[in-house]
Amino acid sequence: MCDWTRTAELDREIEAHVTERKSIITPFTLLGYCSKASLQLKCARSWMQDAIPVRPQPLWNGAIYQHERVRIVYLSADFRRHATAYPMARLLELHDRTRFEVLGVSFGVDDGSDMRSRLIKSFDQFHAVRLEPDHAVAKLLTAREVDIAVDLMGHTQDARPDIFAHRPAPIQMSYLGYPGTTGAEFMDYVIGDAIVLPFDQQEFFSEKIVQLPDCFMVNDSTRPISAQTISRAQAGLPEHGFVFCCFNQSYKISRPMFRIWMRLLARIEGSVLWLSQLNSRAVQNLRNEAMACGIDPERLVFAPWTATQADHLARHRLADLFLDTLPYNAHTTAGDALWAGLPLVTCRGESFPGRVGASLLNAIGLPELVASSLDEYEALILKLATDPSFLQSIRRKLEQNRLSYPLFDTDRFRRHIEAAYLTAWDIWQRGETPRSFRVGLAR
């Protein structure tokens, strides 16, 4: 809600309670408050212990399956128009069907969208189980003799960790939807990369770390961008002023970041801050905070939802620079901006959720847009906003790199994540316990 009146007090209370292993905040909510990986682990473990106090008997009986193809199942409540689904769709379509059989299990709503239809078609089998209890879903996976179960939810809304607590598959992985540890002993691996998940973070993860090359985050290189873009005037933006943009959800906007943005507005005459349409309470809180910083609240412009994702991507053309958040970076939203050709400035954080921007920018050959401190972040944004030739050179480099660097090479990513699956599968087939590993570059 962007209500920061008690932020300092709440931060102290939350840290104290989490340290004492009291479940007063969800692990997902904590990521927006706290960058300490040690506290994130404690919170996740406490939450998981409260959610599943007694572990059910494992359904997988230790059998070593000998299928012609490795059977992978992706589980999610978000197989619809959703930030997790957009980047996943192309990967599901590209999976090598000579080596993998790909199943989908959806425990979320059917929104009737084109994205939902596309996702269903991308699976070899698709099971809608929203009304089925957790143990029944787990039994379904065991009956299908799934080799690898991939959770795309973690601790996000509508997650169902109890399915995995039943141990329906010999290999259970956490990927994409939740940038942190589940704190669950029944999850074997978490998929990241060397930037978001260096091996020195292993002590803060209950899962073993899998490092992909380039970037852990998949992106769909076929997403269309509307040819027609609304005008700045239609979007409520100034025709000639500098447009700072951040389309992150409100829970990612912290007071320190917002105050940096207000200082930038104060220094760049005629500039505006373009945000996603938030709930009315968050909008009013941000307007009040702007006034407290001496900024006319009318310089905050809120973008409504668009009819299509292609239209949303197209309107990025109206902005000059995307401003990332901390301690929880833009994830899919950052990918949207870069795919649409909008440069992004990030500040590298202490833990997984705050390092995603750095990972994305490195994978598209723009490490110069990664700041190592908030002071450096502010100075870099100011330079870009006041030096048109510098900004233009960055925009040209982004356009050149967009289709030539790894970030948007979905098939390259597919080869990497399949190599990760096969490595985990081989470890299991040899009767070894899960271990952390790094995937080599695809040929």
What are these regions, as identified by a protein language model?
Residues 1-238, 249, 259, 288-295, ...:
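Alpha-helical solenoid repeat scaffolds of the TPR/TPR-like class and their adjacent stem/linker regions
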Residues 70-74, 244, 273:
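Conserved hydrophobic helix-helix packing surfaces used for dimerization/oligomerization
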Residues 75, 247-248, 276, 303:
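Short hydrophobic "strand-cap" motifs at the C-terminus of beta-strands
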Residues 99-103, 262-292, 298:
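A conserved nucleotide-sugar
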Residues 243-256:
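Substrate-binding clefts and catalytic carboxylate motifs of secreted carbohydrate-active enzymes
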Residues 300-307:
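Catalytic cores of eukaryotic secretory-pathway lumenal/extracellular enzymes that build
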Residues 323, 337:
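Donor-sugar nucleotide-binding helix/loop cap in glycosyltransferases
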Residues 325-332, 352-353:
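Active-site donor-sugar recognition loop in glycosyltransferases
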